[in-house]
């Protein structure tokens, strides 16, 4: 029942990303500075504005976990950690690898209530990114339709959004993106 600092939480999440505590220097005298550096490098500290050594407030613990879900996993290869496969493509994120989650970024073209239901349907078009892969001239993504969305995101219609989902009928979040 001890409280956990943001630094300690970040260390646990780095191990979840694939870092070996010994090889990565997350133990011993310099563990704290190495943890801070790797957590920052992997985006775990984005929007985390709290002391790293004091007890971590819930909102920042949740932010650390959210950031980790979207962070690419790492592997040890050629005497260094990398977040890419041997073929040069990005490793899966924690969300993709362990939870079957997907992300897509595009324009919410439509959002409406489903007939006779308390849920909504949404069309995502002009998809620019899917599971950390950027769309290119030769690699375009098909539009996506999501169903059974429990929350009303009508206010985000016609905006660029990021969707966190599992399958097309399990949407966990829709977030506005800065243009």
Regions found by a protein language model. Give the residues of each.
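N-terminal propeptides
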Residues: 1-140, 144-178
